Swiss-Prot record:
One of its GO terms (biological process) is amino acid metabolic process. It comes from Medicago sativa. Its main location: cytoplasm. One of its GO terms (molecular function) is L-aspartate:2-oxoglutarate aminotransferase activity. It catalyses: L-aspartate + 2-oxoglutarate = oxaloacetate + L-glutamate. The gene is AAT-1. It comes from the Eukaryota. Its cofactor is pyridoxal 5'-phosphate. GO terms for cellular component: mitochondrion. This is Aspartate aminotransferase 1. Its EC number is 2.6.1.1. The lineage of its organism: Eukaryota, Viridiplantae, Streptophyta, Embryophyta, Tracheophyta. In eukaryotes there are cytoplasmic, mitochondrial and chloroplastic isozymes.
Amino acid sequence: MASQNITPSPTASSDSVFAHLVRAPEDPILGVTVAYNKDPSPIKLNLGVGAYRTEEGKPLVLDVVRRVERQLLNDMSRNKEYIPIVGLADFNKLSAKLIFGADSPAIQENRVTTVQGLSGTGSLRVGGEFLAKHYHQRIIYLPTPTWGNHTKVFNLAGLTVKTYRYYAPATRGLDFQGLLEDLGSAPSGSVVLLHACAHNPTGVDPTLEQWEQIRQLIRSKSLLPFFDSAYQGFASGSLDADAQPVRLFVADGGELLVAQSYAKNMGLYGERVGALSIVSKSADVSSRVESQLKLVIRPMYSSPPIHGASIVAAILKDRDLYNDWTIELKAMADRIINMRQQLFDALRARGTPGDWSHIIKQIGMFTFTGLNPEQVSILTKEYHIYLTSDGRISMAGLSSKTVPHLAHAIHAVVTRVA
C-alpha cells in the first residue's frame, strides 16, 4: 500500500520534539487557587485570588448585569458579527468619560484615543507594545512591589523593566521619599507605571497631596505616566474619587496612558472587558495614535469580543442602570471596608503582637498583612488558609463567619514565629 512508503515524521518517534521542556511553575497568584482546590479540608479559606465574594463566600453577578444580559438576549436586532479592531464605539467613548470625567477638556478637544482591550492585562499589553514600537524611551518603572503580572507583560511587550521604591515594610505604608528619589533619578522620558487607586498588592495609596508632588516630579522630568486603573469605584466606593489621581495628570495638559478593567467594579472577570486610553497633545496626534494602535491589535487578536463590552456600554449610557450599578458597587466596597474593621477588631481583641492598624488604613481589595513567607506557609499547612507568599490577602474573600478563623491563625503564627 502507498502508505507503507511514507517516511516516518520525526514527530512520530518515541521522543517528542518538546521533550526538552521543563514543567513551568504555577502562577504565584493563580497557583494559590490550584492548591486550595486540592485541599479536602472543610475549613479551608482562599484569600489568594482577587475576585469578590458574597458574605456566603459565593461569586457575585451584579443584578444590573443580569438585567442588561436579559435585555441583550431579547434584542433580536443584535448579531455576532466582528466588531471594529478598536472595539465598540459607545464602549470606548463611555469608558473615557468614566475615567477622565464628563467635562474632561482632553475629551472635548478630541485628544483622547480609546480602544477596547482584553480587560486590564490585555490593555496593558497593547499599551506596552505600542510604546515599544513608537516611543523613544523603552524603559518602564514599576513600583516595588506591584502586581505580579506587570513585569512579564511589559518585558514581553519589548520594554526594559526597572523599579522604584513604593512600600515601606517598617511602617506598612508608603515609602514616599524613596519613591521621589527613584523617580527623580530615572532617565528623562522613562515610562512610569502608576496604580490609579487601591494599589495591588499593598492597598497603600498616596494622598492627593502626595499625588500632586508625584505629578510635578513626573512632568518636570518629562516622564510618561501609564496608569493601571483596575479598581475604579471599588476602592472608596466613589467612581470620581478613585479617578482623581488620573484626572490630576490630565488637567495639566500633559500626555499619559490609562489601562482600565471592568473585572472588579462590574464583576465581569471572565468577560475580559477593558480599555486603553492614550491622551495626546492634539487631536491630530490622537488620530495618528489610533491608526498605529490598530496595527498593534490586528495581528495580536484581530478584534475584541462583543458581549462584555455591550454590557458595560448599556450600563454606562443609561442613567437608571448607571445609578443602580453605583449602588451595587458601593455595597461591595463597603463590605470590604467592613471586613477590614472586623479583622482588625478580632486581632486587637486577641492581643495579637504588633500594630495591625494598617489593615484599616489600607484601601481596596487587598491587604498586605506583613506576614513573612514562613508564617504564610504555616497558615496554609496548619490552618488551611491560602494566600500568596508575600502575605497579601484578598479582603473580598473574607466573611463574618471566616474572620475569627483567620484572626486565630494569624495570632498563632505571629506568636510562634517572629
